[in-house]
């Protein structure tokens, strides 16, 4: 059991002196400190001020002394304490009420091992406006002075060397170079500090070393990938017809010739080029300089048999062959055009091509003129109208045609042929797209406000365009091709109404709009006012007529 009174032993007596914690220096640390303290300061640590009799007084500033103490002893190797502050005098002027006072301060500097030095410092002020300001200035001055005097007791490096006149006479002659300000040495806030992005060094590419396949360990199998969700959520709203895929079952009216029909149709017309040349036909040299026209894939699919064809813009024109059909379409749709040899004068002639049908200077592109009915003579495969070597006919195919190619297909189909499922049909109509009933969506025609097509204006007599091709009208008994009705020249521009100069505003057939004369100036019509009738100033004796408003009524 504890003895009586032991419970009070744990509490320190506040009236006893506190023994500081002492950490003894080793002999090596004492020798190191002694060496540092004996060294003298350089000229960069000294400062000078004007003293009595015009002399310079050298001293060490307080901030430099504190920095030297932290450098020599360490920031936790020394401490300072104020031992006493005593006011010597305080005087107040009776008239101005200004304060003058003086006081002295005793400061002790203690090291880690308990070694300390004390010294006195003095502070004063004269004619200060207030007492608080006077005491603040005097106490700070006395404390700083006492601290510097206490630190100089430790050695030369803390300011004691300043009292050596021989040392001052030599050190003041040294020139101090101005220090270069370095921004990197500043302690900056994290938000304002400049962050230099250090680029990571790129490692050189590692060359793959040849490894022995027999000794190399096999790679672990890859983890199975999760099964992908079905695309019903993504493509469920679309229909197969939206992709414009030609389906043989969905379009039974489109017929495609088999592959053997192309060969039979081209081989059976080898003697068609021996017809006589007309007076207006170009010479043989001009025909050889014509550019060969490449038949498209749609032309190759249509033979001279005249079978039904897919929907095309010019379905009313009966095509007699690849070359004849293309020439007729160009002449009927675009009017008169210059001949090929005139159009090609500005361009360099293409290299000559081998043509087997050179008799009488006629080429496969020329159309014969005769008294009998014209015959459709498609050019042979070896004529000049065929595509040059290395060029293939251009056509659009469906993306689904690749999936329908069998895996055992060894040879590709011959150029110029295509299956009905592979061709891309731009005229395919999708049943999933909403369309207004009663509107023809295959053509661009004006629509009235009632939602119906505007009927076309009747064609005037002779208003249709005549066939500009002289070869179509040269033969006897040859019927002209049916022409599409051409719109009247007085008809306004429907596609671009802003370019129509005869545009009218309002309902058709109504009165002219007053805004139609906006581009002309018309002066306002001024009607001449009739003169006033003469009215007598005198009054009558009451004999006036009762209907006269100018006379006074007596009754």
Swiss-Prot record:
Instruction: Report the induction information.
Output: In response to MMS and UV treatment, and in response to heat shock and oxidative stress.
- Write out the annotated subcellular location: Nucleus
Q: Where is this region: Disordered?
A: 197-232, 251-555
SUPFAM superfamilies for this protein: dsRNA-binding domain-like
Q: Which residues bind DNA?
A: 148-152
InterPro entries linked to this entry: DNA_recomb/repair_Rad52, Rad52_fam, Rad52_Rad59_Rad22, Rad52_Rad59_Rad22_sf
Gene Ontology CC annotations of this record: nucleus
Q: Name one GO biological process term.
A: double-strand break repair via single-strand annealing
Keyword Flavoprotein appears in the UniProt entry: no
Comp. bias regions, Polar residues: 283-300, 312-334, 468-478, 491-500
Q: What is its main location?
A: nucleus
Any GO molecular function: DNA binding
What domain of life does the UniProt record list for this protein's source? Eukaryota
Keywords tagged on the record: DNA damage, DNA recombination, DNA repair, DNA-binding, Nucleus, Stress response
The answer to whether the entry has keyword Lyase is no
Check the record and name the Gene3D superfamilies matching this protein: DNA repair protein Rad52/59/22
What are the Low complexity biased-composition ranges? 260-276, 354-375, 382-404, 479-490, 536-547
UniProt function note: Involved in DNA double-strand break (DSB) repair and recombination. Promotes the annealing of complementary single-stranded DNA and by stimulation of the RAD51 recombinase.
Q: What family classification does the UniProt entry report for this protein?
A: Belongs to the RAD52 family.
Quaternary structure, per UniProt, is: Part of a complex that includes RAD51, RAD52 and RAD59.
Its recorded name reads DNA repair and recombination protein rhm52
- Which organism does this sequence originate in? Pyricularia oryzae (strain 70-15 / ATCC MYA-4617 / FGSC 8958) (Rice blast fungus)
Q: What is the lineage of its organism?
A: Eukaryota, Fungi, Dikarya, Ascomycota, Pezizomycotina
State the encoding gene.
RHM52
């Amino acid at each position: 059991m504890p003895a009586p009174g032991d419970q009070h032993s744990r509490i320190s007596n506040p009236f006893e002196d506190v023994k500081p914690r002492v950490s003894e220096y080793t002999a090596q640390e004492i020798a190191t400190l002694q060496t540092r303290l004996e060294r003298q300061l350089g000229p960069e640590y000294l400062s000078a001020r004007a003293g009595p009799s015009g002399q310079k007084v050298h001293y060490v500033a307080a901030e430099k002394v504190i920095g030297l103490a932290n450098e020599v002893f360490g920031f936790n190797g020394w401490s300072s304490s104020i031992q006493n502050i005593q006011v010597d005098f305080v005087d107040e002027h009776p008239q101005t009420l200004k304060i003058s006072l003086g006081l002295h301060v005793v400061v002790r500097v203690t090291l880690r091992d308990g070694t300390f030095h004390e010294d006195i410092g003095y502070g004063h002020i004269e004619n200060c406006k207030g007492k608080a300001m006077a005491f603040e200035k005097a106490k700070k001055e006395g404390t700083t002075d006492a601290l510097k005097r206490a630190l100089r007791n430790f050695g030369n490096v803390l300011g004691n060397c300043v009292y050596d006149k021989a040392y001052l006479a030599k050190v003041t002659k040294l020139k101090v170079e101005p220090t270069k300000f370095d921004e990197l040495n500043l302690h900056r806030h994290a938000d304002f500090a400049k962050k230099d992005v250090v680029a990571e060094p790129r490692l050189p590419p590692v060359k793959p070393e040849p490894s022995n396949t027999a000794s190399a360990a096999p790679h672990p199998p890859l983890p199975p990938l999760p099964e992908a969700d079905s695309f019903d959520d993504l493509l469920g709203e679309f229909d197969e017809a939206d992709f414009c895929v030609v389906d043989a079952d969905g379009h039974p009216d489109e017929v495609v010739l088999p592959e053997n029909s192309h060969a039979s149709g081209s081989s059976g017309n080898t003697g068609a080029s021996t017809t006589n040349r007309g007076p207006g036909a170009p010479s043989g040299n001009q025909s050889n300089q014509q550019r060969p026209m490449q038949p498209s894939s749609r032309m190759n699919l249509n033979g001279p048999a005249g079978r039904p064809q897919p929907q095309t813009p010019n379905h009313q024109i009966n095509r007699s062959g690849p070359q004849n059909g293309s020439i007729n379409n160009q002449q009927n749709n675009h009017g008169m055009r210059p001949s090929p040899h005139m159009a090609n004068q500005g361009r360099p002639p293409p290299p000559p091509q081998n043509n087997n049908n050179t008799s009488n200077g006629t080429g496969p592109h020329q159309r014969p003129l005769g008294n009998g009915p014209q015959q459709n003579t498609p050019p042979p495969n070896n004529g000049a109208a065929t595509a040059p070597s290395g060029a293939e006919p251009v056509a659009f195919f469906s993306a689904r045609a690749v999936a329908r190619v069998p895996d055992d297909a060894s040879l590709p189909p011959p150029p110029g042929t295509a299956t009905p499922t592979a061709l891309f049909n731009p005229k395919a109509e999708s049943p999933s797209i909403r369309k207004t009933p009663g509107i023809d969506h295959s053509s661009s025609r004006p629509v009235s406000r009632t939602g119906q097509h505007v009927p076309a204006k009747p064609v005037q007599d002779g208003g249709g365009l005549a066939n500009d091709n002289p070869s179509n009208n040269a033969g006897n008994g040859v019927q002209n091709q049916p022409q599409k009705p051409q719109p009247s020249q007085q008809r306004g521009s429907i596609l671009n109404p802003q370019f129509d100069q005869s545009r009218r505003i309002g309902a058709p057939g109504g009165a002219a709009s007053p805004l139609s004369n906006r581009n002309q100036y018309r002066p306002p019509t001024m009607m001449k006012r009739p003169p006033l009738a003469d009215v007598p100033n005198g009054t009558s004796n009451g004999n006036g007529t009762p209907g006269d408003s100018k006379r006074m009524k007596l009754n």
